[in-house]
Amino acid sequence: MNMFATQGGVVELWVTKTDTYTSTKTGEIYASVQSIAPIPEGARGNAKGFEISEYNIEPTLLDAIVFEGQPVLCKFASVVRPTQDRFGRITNTQVLVDLLAVGGKPMAPTAQAPARPQAQAQAPRPAQQPQGQDKQDKSPDAKA
């Protein structure tokens, strides 16, 4: 069994449902999307029509999928990596890791980037707070 993420591809899906689950043991958030897709010719004997599929997805991507009374056409980047199901079994599974387009409109790279600068902007704040606490520590010493 390959225990490392491998190169995936691009998947275009009509998303019909999103769902999340939080593990009570670890607190980890699991997310999935359910979609409808045409069955490729010859894929399953003489099967024709559409199939319902479910994919694991990075939980942070769910906020960008907004339903407006109908399924949403989304394009995702995916990788194959080991995932653990609710029964503890580990299997290599296709996981959707990046949202490339919603409703046929490409996602702007800057729309996904703000989370990182905000985290960096928050890093100096704790450094500034101890300085303020030092001043508070000095003032009680000065009174005593």
UniProtKB/Swiss-Prot annotation:
Region described as Disordered: 106-144
Segments forming a coiled coil: none
Q: Which key words tag this protein in UniProt?
A: DNA replication, DNA-binding
Q: A single GO molecular function, which one?
A: DNA binding
What's the domain of life for this entry?
A: Viruses
Extent of Basic and acidic residues compositional bias: 134-144
Q: What are the recorded Gene Ontology BP terms? A: DNA replication
Q: Which residues form the signal peptide?
A: none
Q: Compositional bias (Low complexity) spans?
A: 108-133
- Recorded family membership: Belongs to the inovirus G5P protein family.
Please describe the quaternary structure of this protein.
Homodimer.
Job of this protein: Binds to DNA in a highly cooperative manner without pronounced sequence specificity. During synthesis of the single-stranded (progeny) viral DNA, prevents the conversion into the double-stranded replicative form. G5P is displaced by the capsid protein G8P during phage assembly on the inner bacterial membrane.
What this protein is called in its record is: DNA-Binding protein G5P
- Which species does this protein come from? Pseudomonas phage Pf1
Taxon lineage: Viruses, Monodnaviria, Loebvirae, Hofneiviricota, Faserviricetes
